């Protein structure tokens, strides 16, 4: 996926996670530009949503690069500098799957 805007980058993460995770509700907050996912594991439902979103840290106008962050529940999991036309950061999918798997295994939900 070519990175064109943050909403589509966020959507790509969710689309890829769909195959591995069950969730009961998705809400897109236009004001904060973030998705809120209400996840469940093995039929359990959590009361508080897990928030996964892509935040825009800053632009560098000199070379048109943009720093974006992968955020889970207000914790920055990774930060990447991208340039126009660059591909989706593939390793983000693995980071999220590993992190969410850890959350499930600890039975926090």
Model-predicted regions and their roles:
Residues 18-72:
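Amphipathic, interaction-prone secondary-structure segments
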Residues 5, 16, 34, 105-107:
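Positively charged, low-complexity intrinsically disordered regions
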Residues 5-24:
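Amphipathic alpha-helical segments
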Residues 10-13, 71-109:
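Ampiphathic alpha-helical segments that act as solvent-exposed interaction surfaces
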